[in-house]
Amino acid sequence: MSEHDSIPETALAWHRAGTGAALATVIGTWGSAPRQAGSQLAISGGGDIMGSVSGGCVEGAVVVEALEALKDGLPRVLEYGVSDDDAFSVGLACGGEIRILVEPVGGTLPEDLLAAIVTARAARQPLAYGVTLEGWHRRLLGPADLPARFRD
């Protein structure tokens, strides 16, 4: 795996090392967007980053929100778009919209759930991570849960 393919692993390692970590994941895009849904950015409690959710155009704003999430332990959904004055101020001028889920590891994103994702990835087992934004319910989904998504 390249370093951009090991973002969950990096977030888990930072969390376990005691520096804290948050995981930011693109959960939706509309129009022209630099990164597709599923792209991730790991942010350490010290401000180190690995990965990308926007090709650099909103990473700074996402890092600020991730550090706040580490302080308050709460997840958040961030939205940036060209109709949003904030989008231009943080650099998203590509003509699209992007929606990003930020979760502090060990808080709303349980360490054992992230560890299960890392283990499945290492074993090359198909897996999806599902989050219901209303109520913040989380679960791992496999081929039996999403047969059309995980075809042979």
Regions found by a protein language model. Give the residues of each.
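Segments forming oxygen-rich coordination pockets for charged ligands
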Residues: 1-152
